[in-house]
Amino acid sequence: MCSLFLHKSLVVKVSGIKRNDQILDIGCGTGLLSLKFLTKTDCTITAIDSSTQMIRIFQEKIEKCNLTKKIHCVQQPAEDMDFKPDQFDIISATVALHHVENKQPVIKNIYDCLKGGGRFVIGEIDMDTTGRLDAPKRLLRILDYLKQELVLAMKEGGVQAFERMYDNGKKHILNDGEYCVGFSQWAKLCRDAGFKNVEVYPLKGFEWFKVLVATK
């Protein structure tokens, strides 16, 4: 969908990526963000995802594009990351960490894995799904987002995209593997982990999508 493409483009734009940077792409999926980083400048990427299928598809792309020296894939959930301290210049996660229920330990691990001055760049949905599942105010808050996304899904992808978004929307409402928080909450999580500077960038034309850059 157009919104996700633009979201990933904004992540790369505000990341401050430089030549020869070491990057960790969390929740890499089929590699769209990793490949965008490489089109921006020469860098080395470690890409992780909990899905064996996503990693397999991305690995096929890497081999087809002759990028085995530039991208290394690992099948690993964000909660189980085990990298050396001060290893990466940039750690990115786009529409991935809202699947993590207990976010603080993951953010602290990200902080520890970054070099001094390194950046954590997160692209996410600005939606707060915390609270009691049966709380009316919480439900209305989530529906404000879902109404726009359902319309956008139908417009950009037709009935099939609408059905996928409808099913996903129920997961957001019930916190069924989806645990979104708002960007004020993301900012607090980053500051509590030790990040010195936190900036949030809106995605023009898509009020629910934003990008946060936290600098160590």
Which residues does each PLM region occupy?
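Conserved beta-strand signature within the Rossmann-like core of class I S-adenosyl-L-methionine
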Residues: G118-E124
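Class I SAM-dependent methyltransferase SAM/SAH-binding core
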Residues: L24-I26, T30-D80
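Short catalytic micro-motifs in class I SAM-dependent methyltransferases
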Residues: V95-A96
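Conserved alpha-helix/loop element of class I SAM-dependent methyltransferases that forms part
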Residues: C2-R19
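Core SAM-dependent methyltransferase catalytic element
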Residues: A193-K216
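C-terminal alpha-helical "lid/dimerization" subdomain adjacent to the S-adenosyl-L-methionine
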Residues: I125-R191, E199-V200
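A short glycine-rich, Lys/Arg-flanked "PGG" loop and its adjoining helix->strand segment in the class I
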Residues: Q104-G116
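A conserved beta-strand element that flanks and buttresses the S-adenosyl-L-methionine
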Residues: S92
